[in-house]
Amino acid sequence: LAKEGKPVLSVNAAMNELAAQGVTDLKIQSLHIAPAEEYNQLERMVVKNITKNPGVFKTVKVGYPLLVSEKDLDAVVKVVLASLPKDRKPGDAVVLMGHGNDRGPGDLTLAATAAAFHKADPHVWLATVEGSNSFDNVLPKLKASGAKRVWLQPFMIVAGDHANNDLAGPEEDSWASRIKAAGMTPMPNLKG
């Protein structure tokens, strides 16, 4: 929206604007993948606004992130695997890049998601920019897999800076550069 010259309101400002318009029943939907720090910040902002403005809203509900149940996990794994590049050949590996979080339930959720992807397809790994499921842990597994080509795809709602730089950028510490240095061919697919 900001690129189109439209203002992007903070959660607090958006809630105040909706209250000024007479909205009394409010539903806020998270666009986060896992219940991590940014989702927790959203919840805190909503609670802070409600506390400062008691009685303004009759009801306020905050929707959960994408992955909060085993059913969600199964559905996401199925959809993401179906969306992998059609040019992928047998034996090609895939590394999905999640944002991650270095603590709390978000890290655990993404670890479970990584295990579910790998169980569904042994040539698919999920690694995160932050948190315990780092690319450093995945790279030796890629080497051991014998894959010649490694597809790189973001596991993010918006494939922005992390995908363009950390995943597929030309810097020597990008995942693509590290895969190339390990003797494999990186195949970036930058759709989120």
Locations of the language-model features?
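Active-site-proximal alpha-helix that buttresses catalytic centers in soluble enzyme cores
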Residues: 1-192
